[in-house]
Amino acid sequence: METVQLRNPPRRQLKKLDEDSLTKQPEEVFDVLEKLGEGSYGSVYKAIHKETGQIVAIKQVPVESDLQEIIKEISIMQQCDSPHVVKYYGSYFKNTDLWIVMEYCGAGSVSDIIRLRNKTLTEDEIATILQSTLKGLEYLHFMRKIHRDIKAGNILLNTEGHAKLADFGVAGQLTDTMAKRNTVIGTPFWMAPEVIQEIGYNCVADIWSLGITAIEMAEGKPPYADIHPMRAIFMIPTNPPPTFRKPELWSDNFTDFVRQCLVKSPDQRATATQLLQHPFVKSAKGVSILRDLINEAMDVKLKRQEAQQREVDQDDEENSEEDELDSGTMVRAVGDEMGTVRVASTMSDGANTMIEHDDTLPSQLGTMVINADDEEEEGTMKRRDETMQPAKPSFLEYFEQKEKENQINSFGKSVPGPLKNSSDWKVPQDGDYEFLKSWTVEDLQKRLLALDPMMEQEIEEIRQKYQSKRQPILDAIEAKKRRQQNF
């Protein structure tokens, strides 16, 4: 008798959460696996959809965040249906959090891959990524949407090598009544000149950012990354368009592609549709050429996670041993105090007590953080606070955030006498800096660090003075245009 083997029917692919799933608690529909990182306005987790077995990404957003911006992001994602844009599946309210369920891209962002491998991309790899990215931008721009934050950190790759646009926390919708925007939103080094100048911009602002991203993928960082961001804000609109540090290393086609992206006049800048016909993009190879670098990056990430887990396990063991030592009331002393007993202390060395430890634990025990990097500011996703004060340009908030981080990092450090008040030190009129020779290296380094806030203040004063002169001219031009239209 012939036996018939029964095969399990294949699970359907998740396209959108149905009404039944959306009425349940999210834990009934998904199993959360691990934290991936921080996104705009919230944390991002890897999860599995129980019914289909499909892996998804879930952004958990505290409701005290700017709900208007969150709703805008969801609205934009809901309207998009492209293989080159991260898909949106549905949303839940859970306690004080909003859960946004999105497509999962297992390879992470392009910037993550560059960091993990400690290696920049080849022209072939860049061309393949740019081709998919341009298709995503062509789709968005056709839908009258501006991404406004194109960079390697917001281009995600799935494990097959397909690139998708992500992080719509600052994306905008162009309407018939407002053909251009005049708000400064985005990441400073990638911003187009017209965005910085606040003279209004449209979809081709994303093309400038794409050109900067192409340089970032080739060289590991965007132009001006080595200088203070506030200086970059002034240099981008006034300097000629940036290019490669060593142009001779790159082909004519690649150099020309970047040149067409980085045209300062928006009216003369190429569109996404035009750039898809550029020889550099048209000759791009298939996504299979990205699989080696993806596998290499994922191997590095796995090894780092395993190393972090080993550190946690080791710390747990040390903690356990310390607990055993501290469990008794009395501990035998060592050294000169042989034969005496004293109470064991569990306080740290810096606790200003008269009792010393038998064993000193590290001041900060290692904690495992999934997918954490040292360079958080360039990570795949990050929380943006620019909507907290709508009247303030976002790049200024970027600098303020940096200043807060610097203050936190330097908290508690004593400042040498000559550096306590930066205003006490004046630049010598005669240019005689001999007195600096008597300062220690530490004093000199702290003096150097103190110059940055002074420079930011001076630059801001210059910016305000420049704006006060520039605005009346712009107002006069606008008034003349209106009068001409009336005639």
UniProtKB/Swiss-Prot annotation:
Marked site positions, Cleavage: D326, S327, D349, G350
Keyword check for Ligase: no
Names of required cofactors: Mg(2+)
Residues that bear Phosphotyrosine: Y433
Domain of life from the UniProt record: Eukaryota
Modification Phosphoserine occurs at: S265, S320, S410, S414
UniProt modified residues of type Phosphothreonine: T3, T183, T340, T367, T387
Coiled-coil parts of chain: 290-310
Notes on activation and inhibition: Inhibited by the C-terminal non-catalytic region. Activated by caspase-cleavage. Full activation also requires homodimerization and autophosphorylation of Thr-183. Activated by RASSF1 which acts by preventing its dephosphorylation.
Name of the protein: Serine/threonine-protein kinase 4
Originating species: Otolemur garnettii
Primary gene name: STK4
